[in-house]
Amino acid sequence: MERRTLLVVLLVCSCVVAAAAEASPSRWPSPGRPRPFPGRPKPIFRPRPCNCYAPPCPCDRWRH
């Protein structure tokens, strides 16, 4: 029973340390918005604005 309690305590402590390390402001440039991957931030998909000057406009197909 003592061994199981020790394992639970170690597991909880490791989770607390991991959460504290992720939320530390020294690791991230902006502490309010942590990034999931420190080396490569996930790119945000933004559709390009479409400027059509000709009648057969390809943007009409993209807009729903």
UniProtKB/Swiss-Prot annotation:
PTM section of the record: Disulfide bonds are important for activity especially against Gram-negative bacteria, since the linearization of the peptide causes a strong decrease of activity on these bacteria.
Propiece residue ranges: 63-64
Composition skew (Pro residues), residue ranges: 31-43
Molecular function per GO: chitin binding
Region (Disordered): 22-43
Tissue and organ distribution: Mainly expressed in hemocytes. No or very low expression in heart, gills, inestines, and epidermis.
GO biological process terms, semicolon-separated: defense response to bacterium; defense response to fungus; immune system process; killing of cells of another organism
Signal peptide start and end residues: 1-25
Keywords on record: Antibiotic, Antimicrobial, Chitin-binding, Disulfide bond, Fungicide, Immunity, Signal
Residue pairs linked by disulfide bridges in the UniProt entry: 50-59, 52-57
Span list, region Pro/Arg-rich region responsible for antibacterial and antifungal activity: 26-48
Presence of the UniProt keyword Signal in the record: yes
Region (Cystein-containing C-terminal region important for stability but not essential for antimicrobial activity): 49-62
Binding partners and assembly: Interacts with chitin through the N-terminal region (26-48). This interaction may be important, since chitin is a component of the fungal cell wall, as well as of the crab exoskeleton (permitting a possible action of arasin in wound healing in case of lesions).
Function (record text): Antimicrobial peptide that has a large activity spectrum with activity against Gram-positive, Gram-negative bacteria, as well as against fungi. Shows activity at micromolar concentrations. Displays minimal inhibitory concentration (MIC) values lower than minimal bactericidal concentrations (MBC). Synthetic peptides with similar activities than the full length peptide (composed of the first 23 or 25 amino acids (Arasin 1(26-48) or Arasin 1(26-50))) may have a dual mode of action depending on the peptide concentrations.
The protein, known as: Arasin 1
Provenance organism: Hyas araneus
